[in-house]
């Protein structure tokens, strides 16, 4: 699903390597952002975590998702940090596209 819908290259054994991500995408970062146990930010997911993926073209990836029947569960107005949208993976995990 992640390869087909989001275009993420997944190795045959299920791992995603991005050793050159910083060089390919200046300004990209790995962010670890713990939330309080009682947060509702992950809803409608009941999972304990969510992925936040920085993308080069939010409109383009949302169009790609729509081609595969995946519609955003939430979109946000533009803000200082960029544009965001939330989608759900088939296992019910929320993905924040940024």
Model regions: which residues?
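Core segments of cupin and vicinal oxygen chelate
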Residues: 1-31
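Vicinal oxygen chelate
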Residues: 13, 39-98
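Short hydrophobic-acidic sequence motifs that mark active-site Asp/Glu residues
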Residues: 31, 50, 94
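A generic fold-level signal
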Residues: 27, 45-46, 79
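Short linear motifs in intrinsically disordered
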Residues: 5-9, 52-56, 74-77
């Amino acid at each position: 699903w992640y390869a087909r819908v989001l275009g993420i290259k997944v190795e045959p054994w299920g791992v995603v390597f991005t050793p050159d991500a910083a060089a390919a995408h200046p300004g990209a970062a790995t962010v670890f952002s713990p939330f309080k146990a009682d947060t509702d930010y992950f809803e409608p997911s009941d999972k304990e975590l969510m992925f936040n993926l920085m993308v080069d073209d939010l409109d383009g990836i949302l169009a790609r998702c729509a081609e595969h029947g995946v519609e955003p569960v939430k979109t946000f107005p533009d803000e200082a940090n960029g544009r965001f949208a939330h989608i759900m993976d088939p296992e019910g995990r929320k993905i924040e596209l940024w």
